[in-house]
Regions:
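Catalytic, metal-anchored helix/loop core of enzyme active sites in primary metabolism
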Residues: 1-42, 47-355
């Protein structure tokens, strides 16, 4: 029996996790937390808001599934990593912002870090047990979001409702907007660097509208290995919770005889500059990914509130990065301080852009 603590229980990932737990008697939900919605009776221990690490201390879980949105998930990620508790990570922002500090905590703790992002779950399966010297590169796929194929000029008047209409995935509002700007893929690029210890120049991104191929690994002999499956988050959630076993899910295998078409293309960097901004921040190192993430969270929230135009998201992120020095953080306290500084700067820049 695995004891599961679910953080972010009322979001998209949280709800799908509950489905998986209900279907697997070997999984026991011992604790659940949400940001603001009531969850009384969902688990023996529940919490709304507050310090999630206190809940984790009381719950003593075998696995923490962190589906908190944004930087707020950072303390829970570090709690699990430092204690060697298996971490099923949907909160990519905590690894992006935590960077080298998170990796060091993971190495000290010695537990498993199992990504819940579909692309990184696929990459984990493709890379596991494979000697890194045999790997040429990792390819992450992006659906292209709801605005795939549009030019930059076509995006000036995009409204939040349009950005939230994702063509293939069912996700929460923040990650759906990130998908529309391609920032989500930028964050995933940085996440892949830290998860798999791959240099940035060996991580590629391609647009794949059907979201059937989740990741590919190119090998040095010229061969490529791909992970295919329906775009359904219950598959990577189940994989992370039941690892190293592989349990059944209600998701059917692909019907390869049904005229499956696999289309790939290059991202449009002019229309969607967030991907390039993320790559540059990752390559810069230090706390640049933390600043990138904080500025993006501020800008996306302003866009969803109708205060910032869609194209302003990338502008706020770029200007925030240009205004802040990003030295490496020596500890979690410095990381939190850098996040706060980036949010103040991004908020001020947002006000300037809309007035």
């Amino acid at each position: 029996m695995k004891r599961i603590a679910l953080l972010g229980a009322t979001g998209s990932i949280g709800r799908q996790t509950l489905e998986i737990v209900e279907e697997h008697p070997e999984l026991e939900l011992v604790a659940a937390a949400s940001g603001s919605r009531p969850i009384d009776g969902l688990a023996p221990l529940t919490q709304v808001g507050g310090d999630l690490t206190e809940l984790l201390e009381r719950a003593e879980p075998d696995v923490v599934l962190n589906a908190v949105v944004g930087f707020a998930g950072l303390p829970a990620t570090f709690w699990a990593l430092e204690r060697g508790v298996d971490l099923a990570l949907a909160n990519k922002e905590s690894l992006v912002a935590g960077g080298d500090l998170a990796v060091a905590a993971w190495e000290r703790g010695g537990g498993r870090l199992l990504p819940v992002d579909s692309e990184h779950s696929a990459a984990h399966q493709l890379l596991e047990g494979r000697a890194r010297e045999t790997v040429h590169s990792l390819v992450l796929t992006a659906s292209g979001g709801p605005f795939r194929g549009r030019r930059r000029a076509d995006l000036a008047d995009v409204r939040p409702a349009e950005a939230l209409a994702h063509p293939t995935w069912s996700m929460g509002p923040k990650i759906t907007v990130d998908s529309a700007t391609l920032m989500n893929k930028g964050l995933e690029l940085i996440e892949a660097h830290f998860l798999f210890a791959l240099p940035y120049e060996t991580i590629e991104v391609v647009v794949h509208p059907s979201s059937v191929v989740h990741a590919l690994v190119r090998l040095r002999d010229g061969a490529s290995l791909a992970h295919l499956g329906h775009p359904d988050m219950r598959v990577p959630i189940s994989y992370a919770l039941t690892y190293p076993e592989r349990s059944a899910t209600p998701i059917e295998a692909l019907d390869l005889g049904a005229g499956l078409i696999l289309e790939f293309g290059a991202p449009d960097g002019e229309a969607f500059p967030c991907l390039s901004l993320a790559r540059a921040a990752g390559e810069s190192g230090g706390t640049a990914p933390c600043v990138l993430n904080a500025a993006n969270e501020v800008a996306v929230a302003a866009f969803l509130d109708g205060e910032l135009p869609f194209l302003g998201i990338a502008d706020v992120v770029e200007r925030t990065l240009a205004q802040i020095d990003c030295p490496p953080a020596r500890d979690l306290e410095e990381l939190v301080a850098m996040d706060a500084e980036a949010r103040r700067t991004a908020s001020a820049l947002t006000r300037q852009l809309v007035h």
